[in-house]
Swiss-Prot record:
It comes from the Bacteria. This is UPF0291 protein LACR_1198. It holds the Pfam family DUF896. InterPro entries: DUF896 (IPR009242). Keywords: Cytoplasm. One of its GO terms (cellular component) is cytoplasm. Belongs to the UPF0291 family. The keyword Cytoplasm applies. SUPFAM superfamilies: YnzC-like.
Length: 80
């Protein structure tokens, strides 16, 4: 799930309101939901970036990408 700029703005708005005056029960639930969505989005983006890495040995020029990562890349159609 990707998070929109509007959702990030809403997270910040709720955080400011929480500091200033507190949140209702519904707002607390909305804040928890939006925070979880944001964290899930960050994790998914990070995983996607890591899964595309190819590690090359500086001295030999040989591909030394860990086998586990190579297997994930093969599964996703990024390797032969």
């Amino acid at each position: 799930m990707t998070i929109t700029n509007e959702q990030v703005e809403r997270i910040n708005e709720l955080a400011r309101k929480k500091k200033a005056e507190g949140l209702s029960e519904a707002e607390l639930e909305e804040q928890a939901f939006l925070r979880r969505a944001y964290l899930d989005s960050v994790k998914a983006n990070f995983r996607s970036q890591v899964e595309t890495i190819k590690v090359i040995d500086e001295k030999t020029g040989e591909d030394v990408t860990p086998d586990k990562l190579k297997e994930i890349q093969r599964k996703n159609g990024m390797r032969d």
